[in-house]
């Protein structure tokens, strides 16, 4: 992964680097399962991946460095991660305020297994940062 230092002093400044995660490889064809995850509709993996790639390409075309953290996982962790149906949203995994980085905490039990994967990558990428626990709502 390219080296950079996380820094954010305003939510209105230009994005330079963002962390995304590709969608799960699983469909969510049942509305009950979707509602249990907090969604209001079912999910088709192919459509979700097309939307993700379009979003990623748009950011890259605007000059933003995009890190897909699913590409950085070890093979065994990646196998597990690809089966997590609610890993689309990375905004609450961690945040940067100034030069400090803060861990997020899963607001739903359905997302708890995703957090250690992302947090271990952040620790690897930024060992000098003291990552603090913070509940991001």
Question: What does each of the following model-derived ranges do?
Answer:
Residues 1-137:
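The feature marks the mature, well-folded catalytic cores of soluble enzymes
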């Amino acid at each position: 992964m390219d080296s950079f230092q996380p820094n954010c002093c305003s939510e209105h400044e230009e994005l330079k680097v963002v962390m995304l995660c590709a969608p799960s490889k699983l469909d969510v064809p049942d509305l009950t399962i979707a509602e249990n995850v907090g969604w209001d509709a079912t999910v088709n993996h192919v459509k979700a991946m097309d939307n993700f790639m379009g979003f990623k390409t748009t950011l890259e075309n605007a000059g933003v460095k995009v890190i897909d953290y699913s590409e950085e996982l070890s093979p065994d962790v990646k196998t597990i991660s690809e089966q997590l149906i609610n890993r689309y949203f990375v905004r609450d995994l961690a945040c940067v305020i100034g030069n400090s980085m803060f861990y997020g905490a899963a607001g739903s039990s359905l997302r708890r297994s995703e957090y250690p994967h992302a947090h271990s990558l952040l620790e690897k990428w930024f060992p000098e940062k003291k990552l603090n626990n913070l509940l991001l709502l």
